[in-house]
């Protein structure tokens, strides 16, 4: 771990007293922003009375206030939509976390707002959104309700709210479709719990399901920004008395998410001192790693959280040669409907898009393999 990250983690840890100066305040701020932790850093530093240079402190304060106001506006718009929907909605990730486990609306940036609806309710909700002025680049009736392509993004002119409408918990981003069918969606809906978004009623995932979902999401992004790991830290800290670790392990096995859960919990404990029972980590710890997972694990232990690093992990967990070939092909050459969902392109470019994406992904894969460590630390 580099000194700058180490210093940031000390500031974020309420039990650690800061006794040294940072390597460089500009570097601390830049790193915290890249990791999505700058708002948390600002509030934690204020609580600890850390002497931040005045111009930097003022800049952090202004960014925090702006983010707080933006988040409130987004949540107010989401609350209005929830009142318009007659069907149950599960609010996911950032919006759910800000409304439950975070103590302050300004501590975390909201990107897309993710909501989960039942597949049968998608046409009705799509119609309501359209009537309220929200538009999607893709037509709902052109989508097959599957585990492969299972979401639509809606926006509205002049609104900061970008709504990501899901009808399955696992997003369409490759290669997550491989284990999407293992997720018991009926169980998620049955065990969802009430949530207030401002003054509107909604649902959120039960704590054990939320932990699994956040772990899967963080793995999908190869842990490239630590705010995803901090979300996991927050869920565990907030629910210390309520988390059923035995249930979490059972569901992780059933949903085939033991690997993502292990690496997410390990990173959270390693970086933020999260209270994760050692017996749980030992139960989840991979016993037989393939070459890809050994490289993945070795890079994580070196603090190298690269984009698309998760491909190595996923590749190792595919059982047959035939499925591995399919995985490589689908990763490099996604279906055209998925490509149009992933890329903002002009009509005239469509015939070249598949090759453009394939070459870009191939370069990323070669970059991963080219920089892999020679020895693996288990």
Residue ranges and their predicted role:
Residues 1-111, 117-378:
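Conserved NTP-donor binding/palm subdomain of two-metal-ion nucleotidyltransferases/polymerases, i.e.
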